[in-house]
Curated annotation (Swiss-Prot):
GO molecular function (one): 4 iron, 4 sulfur cluster binding
Protein name in UniProt: NADH-quinone oxidoreductase subunit B
Spans traversing the lipid bilayer: none
Membrane topology term: Peripheral membrane protein
Length: 197
């Protein structure tokens, strides 16, 4: 005798999935859900179905959403830099993907102690990056020499060799701190624009 197929589960009401992302404990909404920029974009898309913008705003939006970063790991901070790109923090969801070549990179993360011997190599790699280029100084050693500040062979901050846009403090800074520095860099790019820097 054939068995009857139970289809009672198909009549269950559909339940919407919970919003994904970092939830703000104060509001219970994902972080950035009340950002006026995104709200105005959503309203304009709902009204017209398309967006009107300037070329500069479009280029800035594209640039902040597709920053390619190059590692310049010199010491222990490089471990936290690698941790930021792993699945737990997943920097690529913010459009921040790693590249191996300076000619394909927009951002250089200097992580660790910069010595006098390594300074010319840092400058050479920085000069190979296309414009506009940005530098994140990660950790106390890259920011100002750190623990080895008084050593004869240490550069007291990578800003003496290349211009730095964002400083991430700590010894070593956590992956969350570096990710916050990346978000600050994206905010700085949006604020500064692309035509003039």
């Amino acid at each position: 005798m054939p068995m009857a197929l139970d289809t009672s589960f198909s009549r269950a009401p559909a339940i919407a999935p919970q919003p994904k992302g970092i939830i703000d404990p104060a509001t219970g909404l994902p972080v950035g859900a009340t950002d006026p920029t995104f709200l105005s974009i959503n309203d304009e898309l709902a009204d017209r179905g398309f967006l009107l913008t300037t070329a500069d705003d479009l280029i800035t939006w594209a640039r902040t959403g597709s920053l390619m970063w190059m590692t310049f790991g010199l010491a222990c901070c490089a471990v936290e830099m690698m941790q930021m790109s792993m699945p737990r923090y997943d920097a690529e969801r913010f459009g921040f993907a790693p590249r191996a070549s300076p000619r394909q990179s927009d951002v250089m993360i200097v992580a660790g102690t910069l010595t006098n011997k390594m300074a010319p190599a840092l400058r050479k790699v920085y000069d190979q990056m296309p414009e506009p280029r940005y530098v994140i100084s990660m950790g106390s050693c890259a920011n100002g020499g750190g623990y080895y500040h008084y050593s004869y062979s240490v550069v007291r901050g990578c800003d003496r060799v290349v211009p730095v846009d964002i400083y991430v403090p700590g010894c070593p800074p956590s992956a969350e701190a570096l990710l916050y520095g990346v978000l600050l860099l994206q905010k700085k790019i949006r604020r500064t624009g692309t035509i003039e820097r």
